[in-house]
């Protein structure tokens, strides 16, 4: 009897310990927030927007655990990610890229949603009561004007973009308008995947004097291939993001996506730490734009590094 009682007591203690461990592993620590991140695809600009957001949270000593989800371009996964975050009672969801923001906003109505790397929030329907963020819209005109100081004889620009990506369509329309106002032409080539890039480059190269790369997920991911192909024919390229310059484009005058993430992170701090209502935080544009030149590409193209535009820009080699 004593042995049986001892076994039962031992078993009960074991069960109690196991239950306690399970609770500890499943529960949040006291005061800990749950923050979800949904990123539409992996590429340098979006990765930097994620990094900047987390950096800002950490600098403000926010106590949180992260649910980090990446769709890798498969948009059907985004509603699943949103449902998972809803079930896990995320306190705030940070979305990177328009499809990510739209997919999460369609599912979650009662928690704050922040976006970054969204070009046209209003056109994308991202103006609800529980959503705000930072737009990466870039005015094409100044970038074109600065480029023309390097290549004044340029008449025809080319661009590749995914016609199914809303951000890309908005940017290309604005680019075409800016070029038309300056009496310049734009040759457009649609692509649906990275596999379309080589043929698109071949089709464009004989028609253009320069290439413009908007922040299109397909195109930005293929930038090393694009840069190499353009360099062979001494065709210069302009980019809307710094990551593309790091991957061989000549010049960008656009968004620093890490700083964009910092800016979105500051909005998260206002909501989570300072108890600001998301309704009182209208969406913002990027605080500042940066001119970045790839000097290795500039040398390949035979440009004078003492040119005023290059001299005054931030530079990488």
Regions found by a protein language model. Give the residues of each.
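Hinge/cleft segment of the Venus flytrap/periplasmic-binding protein
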Residues: 270-317
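Hydrophobic alpha-helical segments within soluble ligand-binding/sensing domains
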Residues: 121-126, 132-154, 255-276
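C-terminal motif of bacterial Sec signal peptides marking the signal peptidase cleavage site
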Residues: 17-20
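Beta-alpha junction/loop-to-helix N-cap segments that form part of ligand/metal-binding clefts
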Residues: 68-123, 216-231, 235-238
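An alpha-beta-alpha
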Residues: 35, 53, 136-182, 282-297
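Bacterial signal peptide processing site
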Residues: 22-24
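Flexible loop/hinge segments that line or gate small-molecule binding clefts
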Residues: 103, 107-141, 239-251
């Amino acid at each position: 009897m004593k042995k049986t009682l001892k076994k039962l007591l031992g078993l009960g203690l074991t069960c109690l310990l196991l239950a306690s461990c399970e609770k500890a592993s499943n529960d949040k620590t006291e005061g800990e927030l749950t923050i979800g991140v949904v990123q539409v695809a992996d590429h340098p600009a979006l990765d930097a927007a994620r990094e900047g957001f987390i950096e800002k949270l950490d600098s403000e000593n926010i106590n949180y655990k992260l649910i980090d989800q990446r769709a890798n371009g498969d948009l059907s996964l985004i509603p699943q990610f949103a449902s998972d975050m809803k079930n896990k009672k995320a306190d705030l969801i940070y979305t990177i890229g328009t499809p990510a923001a739209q997919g999460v906003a369609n599912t979650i109505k009662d928690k704050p949603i922040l976006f970054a790397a969204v070009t046209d929030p209003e056109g994308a329907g991202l103006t609800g009561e529980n959503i705000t963020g930072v737009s990466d819209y870039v005015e094409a005109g100044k970038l074109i004007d600065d480029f023309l100081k390097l290549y004044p004889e340029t008449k025809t620009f080319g661009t590749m973009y995914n016609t199914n990506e809303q951000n890309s369509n908005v940017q290309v329309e604005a680019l075409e308008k800016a070029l038309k106002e300056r009496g310049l032409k734009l040759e457009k080539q649609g692509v649906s995947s990275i596999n379309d890039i080589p043929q698109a480059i071949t089709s464009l190269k004989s028609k253009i004097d320069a290439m413009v790369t908007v922040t299109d997920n397909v195109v930005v991911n293929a930038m090393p291939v694009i840069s190499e192909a353009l360099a062979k024919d001494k065709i210069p390229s302009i980019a809307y993001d710094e990551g593309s310059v790091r991957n061989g484009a000549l010049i960008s005058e656009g968004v620093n996506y890490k700083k964009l993430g910092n800016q979105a992170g500051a909005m998260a701090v206002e909501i989570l730490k300072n108890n600001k209502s998301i309704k009182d935080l209208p969406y913002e544009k990027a605080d500042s734009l940066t001119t970045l030149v790839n000097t290795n590409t500039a040398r390949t193209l035979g440009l004078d590094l003492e040119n005023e535009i290059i001299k005054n820009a931030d530079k990488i080699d």
